[in-house]
Every structure is written in structure tokens, then in C-alpha cells.
Amino acid sequence: MNLRNLFSRRLAVAAMLTVLSTSAALAHVKNLSVLGSFDGHDIGVVQGGTLQASGSGAGNASHIGRFTYIVNATVNLADNSSTGVFLLVFNNGDVIHGSLAGLGESTAPNAAHIVENLTINGGTGRFEGATGSLKFDRIVDGSTLPAFESSSGTLTGTISIVK
């Protein structure tokens, strides 16, 4: 390889790196402040000292619009803490996904207050590469157990999207 070809290749690589670093610097993060409400139903099965719970429902929130949600969690019955995963699905097929950690407390017979902190790990469509955190703060009505329980609450937090 002659010196001229080597110089040309190095110059091309340097130009590519400059373009890539410039485009990354031009990308900006758009933060969406989310405030909304939701209603849903949950079911679960007790296994040993845990409750394997699944929930789903629908809601509407600022900056993201109407959504449906699915939550799968393992609840430690000794301390009412939970861990799991969630999906928020939008009418056009876009998705936000992530993990959750929660804590519940009984507020009355057949009722509980549950707060779940959601960590956004990504998404699809307009939420591709999304990060951030959301909070499900809900009241659960267990008067229809063992068939299911009803819940309603608020969704708050921030979604960060790279544009």
C-alpha cells in the first residue's frame, strides 16, 4: 500500500468519525412530563410466600395520549413489596417497556394503596430509545376476589426521548 492510499484512507476515517460525532451532538433529548389516570383489573395466584400478579387496563395521560397497560409482578407477601415488568401500548402500536418496583399497604378491609415506580428501558415507534421514570399510584378494590380486583389511579413522571 502506498503512502497516498494510506493517507486517503485515514482522511476518510477521520471524516466519518467527525460526521458521526457531530450527528450525535446534534441529537437532543425531549422530556415529556406525564400526568394522567387509568383504570384496570388484576388477577393473581399465591405461590408459597409470594403472589404472582398480572394486571391490565387503560388510561389517558398528557403528552402520550390514550394507552393500555400490562403489568406482571411478583409480590412478597411478608412485606408487600413487588418487582416486575410493564408495557404501555398505544393505539398506533407504539410501546414503552420497562421494569417496576412497588410497595402496597392495606387501607381498609378489601382495599389497598399501591405505588409502583416504573423504570423505562426503551420502546418502539416514537418511543424508540426512551428512558425515564413513571409512577403508578393506585387504589385497589379487592371486594370481588378471588375472581379479580379492580384498581384506579394516576400515572405521573417523565419520559425522555432522543430526537
Residue ranges and their predicted role:
Residues 2-13:
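Bacterial N-terminal signal peptides that target proteins for export
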Residues 26-163:
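Beta-strand-enriched cores of mature, soluble protein domains
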